[in-house]
């Protein structure tokens, strides 16, 4: 079979011929139909993500859409290493598969997986969002952020505040369900005032943070003094991505003086059962609502040239 192979952590994967996997007991061999390229997969392939392995070669890809020998079409997660999803065939535990409805396209299902986990897993599994609560999405102009807006609306959020730097992209978020926007390009003091207004005056119960770095620091600083004297819902700050940096400066006094609860959502903070439940809920909702996501299908044979491509659409490799 042919597969994308990470042969070192400094170069993009290469399209190579390699022996197909053989399933163990309890596993299923899948013919892969589609596998999406995410920042998570890029990070694992270059060794920078916390879940990266240390041994090469391996095939990248944590999830995708495949077909079993019996014809069942499924979405799958967690292929057995070193067999990832970016290959003609892969192997996964049967327990790590979700049947897909016939009306969901292969490439769309694959593209929804990573941002879907980031969003559904965060809102349901970690933040436990309740209908009527307000959500602030930090970094809402990316693929996952746009999904988060739509999902928060679907789950009954009363208000959805979206942040980002690209003014044109911010202006388009209202069509997805954002009720307010905050520009991250404004001066720091103005940004703090905007966040204080959102947290203290308007009221926010859940923050989804796709960025970390300076904007996350500003949100947390704005929350200082916003305690819980009247028993109002606390601010559940869910950290999901770190595009703007891996570290921030956090005052101990901020945590003591506020109702902020810091949470993380990702591989390790969510159980396999919680991940599968979140994704099953997502695909059920997709059959009803059709969440907007822009995709760019690419033949897997073009993996090396597409790997470092910068574009707004989600690249989906088709073996």
Language model: regions and residue ranges:
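C-terminal hydrophobic helical "lid"/dimerization subdomain
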Residues: 227, 272-319
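Adenosine-nucleotide cofactor-binding segment
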Residues: 153-226, 280
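Glycine-rich phosphate-binding loop and adjacent beta-alpha segment
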Residues: 214-288
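Mid-domain Rossmann-like dinucleotide-binding core that forms the NAD(H)/NADP(H) cofactor-binding site
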Residues: 112-186
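Glycine-rich beta-strand-centered segment in the early N-terminal region that forms part
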Residues: 19-37, 48-84, 96
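Local beta-strand N-terminus motif with an aromatic residue
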Residues: 87, 132, 178, 203-204, ...
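Short, glycine/polar-rich helix-capping loops at beta-to-alpha or helix-loop-helix junctions
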Residues: 85-86, 164-174, 247-252
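NAD(P)H dinucleotide-binding glycine-rich loop of Rossmann-like/cofactor-binding domains
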Residues: 62-63, 74-139
């Amino acid at each position: 079979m042919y597969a994308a192979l990470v042969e070192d952590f400094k170069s993009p994967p290469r399209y190579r011929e390699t022996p197909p996997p053989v399933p163990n007991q309890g596993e299923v061999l899948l013919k892969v139909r589609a596998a999406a390229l995410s920042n998570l997969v890029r990070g694992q392939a270059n060794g920078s993500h916390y879940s990266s392995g240390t041994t090469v070669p391996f095939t990248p890809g944590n999830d995708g859409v495949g077909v079993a020998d019996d014809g069942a079409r499924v979405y799958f997660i967690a292929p057995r290493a070193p067999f990832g999803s970016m290959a003609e065939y892969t192997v996964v535990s049967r327990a790590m598969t979700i049947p897909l409805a016939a009306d969901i396209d292969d490439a769309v299902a694959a593209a929804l997986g990573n941002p879907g986990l980031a969003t559904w897993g965060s809102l349901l599994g970690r933040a436990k969002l309740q209908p009527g609560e307000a959500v602030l999405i930090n970094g809402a102009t990316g693929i996952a952020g746009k999904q988060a807006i739509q999902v928060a609306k679907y789950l009954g959020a009363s208000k959805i505040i979206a942040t980002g730097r690209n003014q044109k992209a911010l202006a388009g978020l209202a069509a997805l369900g954002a009720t307010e926007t905050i520009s991250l390009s404004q001066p720091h003091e103005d940004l703090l005032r905007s966040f204080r207004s959102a947290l203290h005056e308007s009221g926010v119960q859940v923050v989804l943070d796709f960025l970390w770095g300076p904007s996350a620091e500003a949100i947390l600083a704005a929350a200082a003094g916003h305690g819980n004297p009247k028993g109002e819902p606390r601010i559940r700050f869910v950290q999901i991505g770190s595009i703007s940096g891996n570290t921030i400066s956090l005052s101990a006094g901020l945590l003591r003086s506020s109702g902020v609860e810091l949470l993380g959502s990702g591989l390790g903070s969510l159980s396999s059962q919680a991940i599968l439940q979140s994704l099953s809920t997502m695909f059920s909702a997709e059959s009803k609502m059709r969440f907007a996501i822009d995709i760019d299908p690419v033949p897997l044979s073009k993996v090396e040239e597409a790997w470092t491509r910068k574009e707004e659409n989600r690249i989906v490799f088709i073996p």
